[in-house]
Amino acid sequence: MEPPAAPSERSLSLSLPGPREGQATLKPPPQHLWRQPRTPIRIQQRGYSDSAERSEPERSPHRPIERADAVDTGDRPGLRTTRMSWPSSFHGTGTGGGSSRRLEAENGPTPSPGRSPLDSQASPGLMLHAGAATSQRRESFLYRSDSDYDMSPKTMSRNSSVASEAHGEDLIVTPFAQVLASLRNVRSNFSLLTNVPIPSNKRSPLGGPPSVCKATLSEETCQQLARETLEELDWCLEQLETMQTYRSVSEMASHKFKRMLNRELTHLSEMSRSGNQVSEYISNTFLDKQHEVEIPSPTPRQRPFQQPPPAAVQQAQPMSQITGLKKLVHTGSLNINVPRFGVKTDQEDLLAQELENLSKWGLNIFCVSEYAGGRSLSCIMYTIFQERDLLKKFHIPVDTMMTYMLTLEDHYHADVAYHNSLHAADVLQSTHVLLATPALDAVFTDLEILAALFAAAIHDVDHPGVSNQFLINTNSELALMYNDESVLENHHLAVGFKLLQEENCDIFQNLSKRQRQSLRKMVIDMVLATDMSKHMTLLADLKTMVETKKVTSSGVLLLDNYSDRIQVLRNMVHCADLSNPTKPLELYRQWTDRIMAEFFQQGDRERERGMEISPMCDKHTASVEKSQVGFIDYIVHPLWETWADLVHPDAQDILDTLEDNRDWYHSAIRQSPSPTLEEEPGVLSDPALPDKFQFELTLEEEDEEDSLEVPGLPCTEETLLAPHDTRAQAMEQSKVKGQSPAVVEVAESLKQETASAHGAPEESAEAVGHSFSLETSILPDLRTLSPSEEAQGLLGLPSMAAEVEAPRDHLAAMRACSACSGTSGDNSAVISAPGRWGSGGDPA
């Protein structure tokens, strides 16, 4: 493989340790390590309970996770398009490992699916098998080659998902699992070359005599096999020599995944300015910047002038005091007439109808909130605890349970658009469904189940509606108290446990001291894992666990220690926290509206303070649809893909819904209506028009870019670096045609350059500090849409009209604009954009 190219100076970059002086760079793994025989995984069930009384109910046969929706997909534009390899910003960089040579001398038959080769007394479990229905499912960026930094998407394509399933193989991407697989291969080759039979022992219970005898191999073949075996052993030694002894093996995968994500984000950021914004958002939110990420600041010409933030005036308070607690009084008459679902409501029948889907994926939590009088968290929490019989198992008084639930829900902020009690109820219900996954049946103890549900319920309590970085940048008391480390997550834990000390709120009062300590430790671990900056570490831990079991001979995930068990539980709650894109589309779109409203509200606060506005928080520039596509491609899909491997085939429907939703948002970008020629002259005159840019370039569009590029014109980057050069602006216009989806990017950059040259217009008053009701629409109230934005688009969101490709309109405009600067009347075919991109909306 070719060495990686040096990253662009303007791209996002990871500060990763390079090789020591005099040390050669690590070789890429042997090609066959990309593919290993598909090994079924079984999660061993427990045979005990830690509750006071062992009364295990009769368990129903295994069944897949049910979906609560029955959505007609006929009107989804995304489902009618050809499904592509994703992420869309980088169309394949793999080397097509399916053609590489593989040596499979040791791979014998798989064990019986009902019994562990290591433990004859193990309970029957669910095995991980390849499903024919999933053979066409696309794979995440984690399955791209780690070494192909400089391969062009024009010349490379990768269809590994189809090939791997067709050959019954798994793709192995975590370094430690690759080392294990390589050592097994070396062992097999050694046996073949020396005619030494492989003993049937615990290292190779599946093995047997090699399927190929040395006598049947030619001398040349034996020499080649020996060389390849030696090279593979050298590669293993090199990997082990560079492993840092004080770090876990999963950190090798975390290090690799972050490097690969950085490469993907670099490609995305180079596509357009909005692509750079999406990249910056993902990098800032989901990578632990404190130690590993270094993002270059904008150049002086790019950074707008901003007033320094005003000095914060705050009342001094003891640092040991937990903020956000309220003195609430809930009547003690709750234990007299306990409502059926824990909350008083006049629509109990409708609520009961909705809660029939409590154990199904895709429960409409918005309807539950409406029928429960806005008490969705209390309703869901009480109903789940009753259904799982946790009140009896842990002797939780009903009135105490109800008092704590109501107190907890009251400490969620109803005026926060997304991180409110509705989100907590959704995560709680999603965790409940994931705990009921057939593959995890009888795996976790009652105490672990209680801890997971409690962690989901409190994981965002007293959330202020701003990010950790905002609190750090504003020197908030919370950031000072928790030393800038997982600020909000630590606060949620403190509030959640502190509320147990309120009157008649201690739902764990009858737990033993040991149970209480164990539960607290688990809850802390799970809630801290909801810090999105820890995402790549969590993903690497889980994927290393799954792939290590795939390449071992047993294929049994024992989960026989705290570290392994809490690792699965942490990822479960993390998956539930990132489950919005996997829900039915109508629910997903509502969640998207809410999270964008919260982002925009934070952006308004940052603008008021004169701070730099966080990525995706500026309502004038954020591209909602593209942010969701990038969010799915780089964050949600790799996580759920790995979870689906763990519990296969139980999460296949969830992956299908995720793919459908991603296609819908992608199609919403491509199918938005174009502005009419009559509207175009006024586009640049509207200072409130959002900057929205297309971040995806298809292969055809890139070819078009090459063919339509005007010789002698400066590149986009050079033009942007000279904002006051009006001639450069005019020359930039003639290059837009080749990147037609990014037309508005250039238009808006020119608009900003013009504004900076003539003095930026006074900023209009926007909705700041807006309060949101859980039952009302969110985004439409943020600002008044301009006429060009009122074209049909996503419900409650600005239209994508300015972004969509309209070649015919452009061609007509080009012919009418032959007088533009930098073009000539006899060469209208190479004019790049309509005349509206000229200064003042008229041809230059």
From Swiss-Prot:
Keywords: cAMP, Cytoplasm, Hydrolase, Isopeptide bond, Magnesium, Manganese, Membrane, Metal-binding, Phosphoprotein, Ubl conjugation, Zinc. Residues 51-78 have a biased composition (Basic and acidic residues). The keyword Zinc-finger does not apply. It is a peripheral membrane protein. Pathway: Purine metabolism; 3',5'-cyclic AMP degradation; AMP from 3',5'-cyclic AMP: step 1/1. Mg(2+) binds at D460. It is an enzyme of class 3 (hydrolase). Mn(2+) binds at D460. Zn(2+) 1 binds at H423, H459, D460, D577. The modification Phosphoserine is found at S13, S147, S152, S160, S204, S333, S672, S674. Zn(2+) 2 binds at D460. Interacts with LYN (via SH3 domain). Interacts with ARRB2. This is 3',5'-cyclic-AMP phosphodiesterase 4A. It comes from Mus musculus (Mouse).
